[in-house]
Amino acid sequence: MSRIRKYSVLLLCYVLLLCCVVTAPIPAKADRAAQSPQFMPGVTEEMTDPAFWSGLTNDPDALLATPEEMAQINAAAIATEGSNRRDMRSLKETYDGVARNQALQESAADDVKYYLGWIWDQNGKKLEQEDFDIITANVIDPNATEEMSVRWGIAVNRTDLITFPWDGQLLDDPSDIDFDYQPLVGIRVNEPVAVYSTSADGKYFGVTTSCCTGWVRVEDIAICKDKEEWLSAWDLPAEKRLVFWGDKMYTDYSNSASQASGRMITMGTVLERMEETDPDALVINRLPLHNYAVYLPVRNEDGSYSKRPALINARECVSEDYLPLTTANLAKVALASLGDAYGWGAGLNNEDCTSLNHSIFCCFGLDMPRNGTWQQLVESMPRIMIGAYTLEEKEALLDALPLGSLLNFPGHQMMYLGKQAGQYYVVSTVSSLMSPYSGKRQRTRCCQINTLDIKRANGKTWISELNRIFIPWVSLSEGEEYPQPELPTYHEYTSFVLEKGLMDPYPTGYFLPDRASTRAEAVEMLWRIAGKPEPDMEAEGFSDVAAGSDHEKAALWAKQAGIYSGEDGQFRGNTALTGNLLDELCQRFLDDAPDGLVPQTDDVLTRAELAQAAQAIWTANEAQKLPETTAK
């Protein structure tokens, strides 16, 4: 009986436990709203409306540049050595194929030197020299001769111009297959290319576009019978152009026109409009009601070019000829790609930062150099170099900039939208930045609007890193400068100390030139001029300078070098700096300080005055370094 009773008790406990599990209430999840589109801090939904930004301009429909003026800007870019812009109409029709093979080998070898040691393929294999040897062997055209004729090609698909004639990816992170260094630039449907070589495996053409040179898949290019047919495909008169200015669209599917079905059309694509015909005439088996009838290029089975009718819905983002370059139209095109994925080199059928701006301006007939490095070579394009501007000076300049100006810092380009509620806004396609929520590096990989106080992955704000501004539609005469706000009298000195790294802005980013300078700032400045020598960290320092504090090394150096001994064993770094004290420090710092090098006064020096003195001290110190020379 005891054993039966024992199992009965165990069974009862199990049943009770099961009841508890079944009947116990499940903790309710916190109510969460369904996901909605996210925006960066400070960005609202109304800011995604182009009219929000163009409405900040007095006359958003005023013409910023005429087609003739933009043609002159295009010509200036083409004439600029190193811009990689070329007039496709003027390309020579013959070339030395053997010499080109040699040039391709040398160029590929240079690319390998750049990538070797930090690149993986899509299978997670780190690429070694022997891997690159196999890849680069494919650049050789086995049929090259000393005298060859250019083959004139037309892109039949939106495709990528890539670095190597190779099906693989070039990844800096084997876990991140969406960031591929292979693409150089996107090639749009109906874009012309000049074909100079075929890869050893026959899968790729070596081509030149209007802005870049690289490799493209053979199946994406149709070869015209001659240059005349090639020119007729893309060098269109204004009355025949249809320009797509949205992010992307796809042609309708039709069983009777499979070659024209489902074709991706991307920003900046220019297609040929068909001539008007009988109103009852069918286009791909239907009337072209509410549609533009156009021609799309196709590649025949033998690789040759032909064109087929297609329909483009008139409700798409299309324009008869290039859009007039106005503020309203610029805002409309600039925001058309919001939310699209980032694609390095215009990969993933999308854009990177500079290719987006290139595509935007192509919608107006302005064909800029492909990237910021090449753009800055064009002398006639206004280039305002602001790397050494204080934050106050940058803000004054931004206040005067028009929408559509291109702002740059190393590694990124963005388009300026305007100022709202004291914040400066830009649109760009971004790979990564410091998350404003977690403070960690985050892959945004998106075309987005954000403020300039957002931080890069290095922790610095975008506005603090700005170093160049371009205004693409303005052409300057030789020696002419783009008008900008008058710089303050102290700009020479503040820009000097910022460029040399002798003084820093405050953590807010502002230089605050009128604020009183301090002893710590003066000692820090002298230490930096001296080259930041390492002091004896074990030696006795100042009682009020904590280990690891901002000015610890500078303070120790100044004490050990006999430049500044402090007061009563204290550094007193936050004490205001007078001209006389700076003069004393200067006399001890320089072997032979010139008279009047710094202000000799009991008045407190402002940060602008300290910057002026820093420039003078730096110059005197450099002069003392120069070896004595004998005049001949």
Task: Show the residue positions of the predicted features.
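Sec-dependent signal peptide cleavage junction
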Residues: V21-R32
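Boundary regions of SH3-family modules and the immediately adjacent low-complexity/disordered segments
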Residues: D31-I162, W166-D173, D178, A194, ...
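Aromatic- and glycine-rich peptidoglycan recognition patches
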Residues: R32-P50, C211-G214, E219-T251, S258, ...
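SH3/SH3-like (including bacterial SH3b) beta-barrel domains
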Residues: D172-R188, N255-M267
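...with weaker cross-activation on analogous glycine-rich loops/strands in unrelated enzymes
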Residues: G186, P369-Y437
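Glycine-rich catalytic cores of cysteine/serine-nucleophile enzymes that process amide/ester linkages
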Residues: K248-A310, G339-E351, N408-D453
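Active-site nucleophilic cysteine motif
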Residues: W344-Q375, R519, V523
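Feature responds to low-complexity, polar/acidic, surface-exposed segments characteristic
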Residues: E480-E492, E499-K500, D504-V523, W527-A554, ...
